[in-house]
Amino acid sequence: MMAAQPTIREVLFNPVFQNNPIGLQILGICSALAVTSNLKTATVMAIALTLVTGFSNLFISMIRRQIPSSIRMIVQMVIIASLVIVVDQVLKAYAYSLSKQLSVFVGLIITNCIVMGRAEAFAMANPPLVSFFDGIGNGLGYSAMLLVLGFVRELFGAGKLYGISVLPTVNDGGWYQPNGLLLLPPSAFFLIGLIIWALRTWKKDQVEAPTYKMAPQVSSKEAY
């Protein structure tokens, strides 16, 4: 008996909270650390990855029955790389300064675990329309995490949002002393940890079963 096909609503909204690519699957961490020092770069990266994931899923699903199993990963990489090149060229043409800030991380979307994972695990086994929305949904889940990180890091690290002053800083005669630590990549790692803790506190079903049990404490005499 074939399993029921997931609905568009499920694949679009489940990755945001229920099965978040970063929060639950722990994928796409590297770019999340690097591009979230401000909301502008976080937003552009989020849009870029969402579009690439959605359209790569769509195109791969459309030709999934014609792809030989032995070269399916190569075909997936070619499609994803082509889409990433288009995104990169558009950024260089219309938002060159942002393209410079994002540096190599747009190009590294090609090897992003979220994009590759959805292409292999979902698009190769499902129809084009639902595959497209699965890609968009996972992109939205990734985007939500990036925007939260970018919001916290830019607001409390520089007192700004999208480059606009929100908290008047001491250097400008205001009251807020920016926390420069939040602008460093390691701070994003700790923030991601806090978000994961909050998600798993809220949704108990996301808590993983322990892989081992601590041995009971024994006295030194019993140990020997």
From Swiss-Prot:
Protein name (database record): Na(+)-translocating NADH-quinone reductase subunit D
Protein localization: Cell inner membrane
Protein role: NQR complex catalyzes the reduction of ubiquinone-1 to ubiquinol by two successive reactions, coupled with the transport of Na(+) ions from the cytoplasm to the periplasm. NqrA to NqrE are probably involved in the second step, the conversion of ubisemiquinone to ubiquinol.
Membrane spanning residue stretches: 43-63, 67-87, 104-124, 132-152, 179-199
HAMAP family per the UniProt record, alphabetical: NqrD
Xref: NCBIfam families: nqrD, PRK09292.1, PRK12405.1
GO BP term (any one): sodium ion transport
Single GO MF descriptor: oxidoreductase activity, acting on NAD(P)H, quinone or similar compound as acceptor
Key words, A-Z: Cell inner membrane, Cell membrane, Ion transport, Membrane, NAD, Sodium, Sodium transport, Translocase, Transmembrane, Transmembrane helix, Transport, Ubiquinone
Catalytic activity: a ubiquinone + n Na(+)(in) + NADH + H(+) = a ubiquinol + n Na(+)(out) + NAD(+)
Record note on quaternary structure: Composed of six subunits; NqrA, NqrB, NqrC, NqrD, NqrE and NqrF.
Any one Pfam family match given in the protein's UniProt record, by short name: Rnf-Nqr
PANTHER family: ELECTRON TRANSPORT COMPLEX PROTEIN RNFE, NA(+)-TRANSLOCATING NADH-QUINONE REDUCTASE SUBUNIT D
Chief localization: membrane
Top EC group: translocase
Source organism of the structure: Pseudomonas aeruginosa (strain ATCC 15692 / DSM 22644 / CIP 104116 / JCM 14847 / LMG 12228 / 1C / PRS 101 / PAO1)
Membrane topology: Multi-pass membrane protein
Keyword Transport found: yes
